[in-house]
């Protein structure tokens, strides 16, 4: 079975002052603090969360 693709996501801006739903998306992606980097699976759900808070993130494939 082929390995699923992953996306590396880094939180580059603080969550202070953002909308609660945007903070929930960051938590859903596993991001806890500024400059925190995680690798998430390349699924439509994760891509939707990344798209919603793209102004806070740096994304690498």
UniProtKB/Swiss-Prot annotation:
It comes from the Bacteria. GO terms for cellular component: cytosolic large ribosomal subunit. Signal peptide: none annotated. GO terms for molecular function: structural constituent of ribosome. The keyword Ribosomal protein applies. Keywords: Ribonucleoprotein, Ribosomal protein. InterPro entries: Ribo_uL30_ferredoxin-like_sf, Ribosomal_uL30_bac-type, Ribosomal_uL30_ferredoxin-like. GO terms for biological process: translation. It holds the Pfam family Ribosomal_L30. CDD domains: Ribosomal_L30 (cd01658). NCBIfam families: rpmD_bact (TIGR01308). Belongs to the universal ribosomal protein uL30 family. Part of the 50S ribosomal subunit. This is Large ribosomal subunit protein uL30. The lineage of its organism: Bacteria, Pseudomonadati, Pseudomonadota, Betaproteobacteria, Neisseriales.
């Amino acid at each position: 079975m082929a390995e699923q693709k992953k996306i590396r996501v880094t939180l580059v801006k603080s969550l202070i002052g953002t909308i609660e739903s945007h903070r929930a998306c960051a938590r859903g992606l596993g991001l806890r603090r500024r400059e925190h980097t995680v690798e998430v699976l390349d699924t439509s759900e994760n891509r939707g969360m990344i798209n919603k808070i793209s102004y806070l993130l740096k994304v690498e494939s």
